[in-house]
Amino acid sequence: MSMLSFLLGEKKKTASVAKERLQIILARERVGGNGGGPDYLPALQKELMAVISKYVDIDVNDIKVHLERQENLEVLEVKIELPDASR
């Protein structure tokens, strides 16, 4: 069966592809790919907005994404302000 998979090619699962991409982004950031800050944060905020807006009516300013670095520790903070359910 492995020979058949080798000849026909085996498609990677979406989750494993996403995991590999995230690992590449994180590795590049740790090495210091850009001195100012992570360039993926605006894209991450935009994608979070797209996903959350499928379920809840929110404004683009209701999502805040922040990355903080302290010595050998990185903290990714995501704040999402959800609308009051009583309205």
UniProtKB/Swiss-Prot annotation:
BP GO annotations: cell division; regulation of division septum assembly
Gene3D superfamilies: Cell division topological specificity factor MinE
Entry-linked SUPFAM superfamilies: Cell division protein MinE topological specificity domain
UniProtKB keywords: Cell cycle, Cell division
Signal peptide interval: none
UniProt KW Cell inner membrane keyword: no
Similarity section: Belongs to the MinE family.
Annotated function: Prevents the cell division inhibition by proteins MinC and MinD at internal division sites while permitting inhibition at polar sites. This ensures cell division at the proper site by restricting the formation of a division septum at the midpoint of the long axis of the cell.
Protein name stated in the entry: Cell division topological specificity factor
Species assigned in the record: Delftia acidovorans (strain DSM 14801 / SPH-1)
Lineage, highest ranks first: Bacteria, Pseudomonadati, Pseudomonadota, Betaproteobacteria, Burkholderiales
